[in-house]
């Protein structure tokens, strides 16, 4: 399974691509950071993010997209930008017809480190170790995106299939 993980952000949006199967080490395919200029108008920043993520989805052709779920932050301006970037990220996968799953930061931390309370340094160290990299992915947004992708490979594939089966059952359809 190839998964594109997205750590949404309006100024820096991390994107990580891995391949793997549950219970096995994943393989790094690529990672990127999409940057927007804070001095640009919001519509231009969102448009740049949309075009960049759409191009990365087309380039890497993932089987699934994993996006970090926006959580409440004290800075309303920051959370608004992150929420807008998250919407663009979800749309990039949905527009391509690819299943999109969202994860809370604690779900990702628990999947990758075994602790939902892990800090950034622990997360980056585990991503580096799990992907057998010679050096940590930089910046942290890229490491976070790779952690999301790893989490989805290990947990999300099953979660997505269960959700699809439940949806089919609700609509009265079989397999």
Curated annotation (Swiss-Prot):
The active site is at residues 7, 68, 141. Keywords: Cytoplasm, DNA damage, DNA recombination, DNA repair, DNA-binding, Endonuclease, Hydrolase, Magnesium, Metal-binding, Nuclease. GO terms for cellular component: cytoplasm; Holliday junction resolvase complex. One of its GO terms (molecular function) is magnesium ion binding. Its EC number is 3.1.21.10. Mg(2+) 2 binds at residue 68. Its cofactor is Mg(2+). CDD domains: RuvC. Mg(2+) 1 binds at residues 7, 141. Binds 2 Mg(2+) ion per subunit. It catalyses: Endonucleolytic cleavage at a junction such as a reciprocal single-stranded crossover between two homologous DNA duplexes (Holliday junction). Disulfide bonds: none annotated. GO terms for biological process: DNA recombination; DNA repair. It is found in: Cytoplasm. Belongs to the RuvC family. Homodimer which binds Holliday junction (HJ) DNA. The HJ becomes 2-fold symmetrical on binding to RuvC with unstacked arms; it has a different conformation from HJ DNA in complex with RuvA. In the full resolvosome a probable DNA-RuvA(4)-RuvB(12)-RuvC(2) complex forms which resolves the HJ. The RuvA-RuvB-RuvC complex processes Holliday junction (HJ) DNA during genetic recombination and DNA repair. Endonuclease that resolves HJ intermediates. Cleaves cruciform DNA by making single-stranded nicks across the HJ at symmetrical positions within the homologous arms, yielding a 5'-phosphate and a 3'-hydroxyl group; requires a central core of homology in the junction. The consensus cleavage sequence is 5'-(A/T)TT(C/G)-3'. Cleavage occurs on the 3'-side of the TT dinucleotide at the point of strand exchange. This is Crossover junction endodeoxyribonuclease RuvC. It comes from Salinispora arenicola (strain CNS-205).
């Amino acid at each position: 399974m190839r998964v594109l993980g997205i750590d949404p952000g309006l100024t820096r949006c991390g994107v990580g691509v891995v391949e793997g199967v549950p219970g096995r080490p994943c393989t790094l395919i690529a990672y990127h950071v999409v940057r927007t200029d804070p001095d640009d108008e919001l519509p231009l920043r969102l448009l740049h993010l949309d075009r960049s993520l759409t191009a990365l989805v087309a380039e890497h052709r993932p089987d699934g997209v994993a996006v970090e779920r926006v959580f409440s932050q004290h800075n309303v301006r920051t959370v608004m930008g992150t929420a807008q970037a998250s919407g663009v990220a979800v749309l990039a996968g949905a527009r391509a017809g690819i299943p999109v799953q969202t994860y809370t930061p604690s779900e990702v931390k628990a999947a990758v480190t075994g602790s939902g309370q892990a800090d950034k340094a622990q997360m980056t160290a585990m991503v580096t170790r799990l992907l057998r990299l010679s050096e940590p992915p930089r910046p942290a947004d890229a490491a976070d995106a790779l952690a999301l992708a790893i989490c989805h490979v290990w947990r999300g594939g099953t979660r997505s299939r269960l959700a699809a089966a439940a949806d089919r059952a609700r609509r009265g359809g079989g397999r």
